[in-house]
Amino acid sequence: MSDSFYRYDVIVIGGGHAGTEAALASARAGARTLLLTHNIETVGAMSCNPAIGGIGKGHLVKEIDALGGAMARAADLAGIQWRTLNASKGPAVRATRCQADRNLYRTAIRCIVEAQPNLTVFQAAVDDLIIHHGASEADSVRGVITQTGLRFQAPSVVLTAGTFLAGKIHVGQTQYAAGRMGDPPATTLAARLRERPFAIDRLKTGTPPRIDGRTLDYGVMAEQPGDDPLPVMSFMGQVSDHPRQVSCWITQTTEQTHEIIRNALHRSPLYSGQIEGIGPRYCPSIEDKVVRFAEKTSHQIFVEPEGLEVAEIYPNGISTSLPFDVQLALVRSIHGFANAHITRPGYAIEYDFFDPRGLKASLETKAVGGLFFAGQINGTTGYEEAAAQGLLAGLNAARHVQGLPAWSPRRDEAYLGVLVDDLITHGTTEPYRMFTSRAEYRLQLREDNADARLTGVGRAMGLVDDARWARFAAKQEAVQRETARLSALWATPGNALGREVADALGVTVSRETNVLDLIKRPELTYATLMRVPTLGPGVDDAQVAEQVEISVKYAGYLDRQRDDIARQQRHETTPIPDGFDYASVRGLSIEVQQKLERVRPQHIGQAQRIPGMTPAAISLLLVHLERARRSQVA
């Protein structure tokens, strides 16, 4: 085998949502990339819920897409039921979600991966990292060693091991080593990583039993059809990309369900002390819900199809690790599930994760140069959170090799920026899930403007191809052209346009009014305004129309938020040098020094967000940094 077979610029370990986005981003950025996976057949597999998007999560998917990523495109090709959540609320919190055919989704991701230039896939489990220990320099990664002893070399490595590091499955009192049900864990790699200078702990997640949908009584459930018209996830997508659409269904647990669970809690690994890892707060098991919300007589369950050509359904809301006999009893006590056949048991899985405060904003580890972490191993939960981290880590792994500066978005630029800043500043003791409420500038960080925020940046770094760039440029030009057209038109009580507005919309124009200002009225939208003969029919691209309307209707709020951001940014990006000696700053308390030493913030903005950090301490830091800067100039 040629030497080039073993040498790459970037190696990505793991072919899940983080790993595929990392490998694709690295390759798009121009790095010769190797994706190592224990099983090529599971590249892009949806291990848990067959769905993409949702509140906060859909925003991340749109950002991944704006940067040229694959998740949104795959969702458009696999989405079998589509909904816009919070559709009646403001644009900041509207979110796209699709139920996906897991086989179509996996196929779409694999096709995208295999079509990507600069990217090679090889099936091999990784057992160790090759680390260079320099006498006078920091440790740095040099490659990986596989289970079969192959040594692949690269100056950048991205680890995206998901739940596989020392993974342990629990079903009742039964427990065994696994990365997920049916897949072996990365036990040797986990042991080697524990020998490295990383802070490692355990987390837990779970999944519900799967059910044969042919054994359910849908007549007692509430049908939940998708939206009409259908949304799309990708800025490059169109409704014709979607496969055949189906409904989901809604049912509830019963008091009998809760009684079965309460009587079996002593057999639950969650309550017996068998499971040590902390699970996701916002996706609790059914036994956890019954205990925590004892006053409730029922809990909602979403009955979600796993695909168009399979009978299995995913009962969203009954994740459990109870013994199988208890699972069978509780499932059959649910409305419409009396004759349900379980095809796969529910289970909990514990796994190793790394304290994300040991990462830079680029997702490079502070302890080992060139080594990047992404996904669940950083303490997050969810496909979307993993994929977003993967894209960022893969990009920066490539830039590390190319000698280019790392990139990470700020909190006011992307939900990805919020995600990373939260993790590396605060760390986490439970699986971290993205919500719109985590972003202080969420009116700026909408799904609809993710391309306006990020596609230009992605293009400059090589992530965005010509087709996407051309589509984006055409959309931006159309928005500007339509805004200019409307801004040039005025309605008065006496002119023809004013009379048309009154006749078509029943709106009285009492004084000279710019047409754009009419959109600011609560009762008017761009679409209703286009019913005025002189103004219509308007643009036929819904995305363009949406941008025109939002930019006008929310102009005052957006301007105020931009002013807030400008004030915040005055010192946000002031860098703090690597290895900065906090003990040298006179006046800093020991407590503050310890907090700063533990997090090692890269800039003042990150330091400000450390819990317990005082304005006085930040002022002292700024004075010291400015004094040091002046002395260097002198």
Curated annotation (Swiss-Prot):
Assigned protein family: Belongs to the MnmG family.
Keyword Manganese (UniProt): no
MF (Gene Ontology): flavin adenine dinucleotide binding
Binding site for FAD: G14, G15, G16, H17, A18, G19
Gene3D superfamilies named in the record: FAD/NAD(P)-binding domain, GidA associated domain, C-terminal subdomain, tRNA uridine 5-carboxymethylaminomethyl modification enzyme MnmG/GidA
Swiss-Prot/TrEMBL cofactor(s): FAD
Biological role: NAD-binding protein involved in the addition of a carboxymethylaminomethyl (cmnm) group at the wobble position (U34) of certain tRNAs, forming tRNA-cmnm(5)s(2)U34.
Cross-referenced NCBIfam families: mnmG_gidA
Primary location group: cytoplasm
Gene Ontology BP terms: tRNA methylation; tRNA wobble uridine modification
Keyword Flavoprotein attributed: yes
Record note on quaternary structure: Homodimer. Heterotetramer of two MnmE and two MnmG subunits.
Record GO cellular component, one term: cytosol
Localisation per UniProt entry: Cytoplasm
Residue positions binding NAD(+): 279-293
Protein's name in the database: tRNA uridine 5-carboxymethylaminomethyl modification enzyme MnmG
Alphabetically ordered keywords of this record: Cytoplasm, FAD, Flavoprotein, NAD, tRNA processing
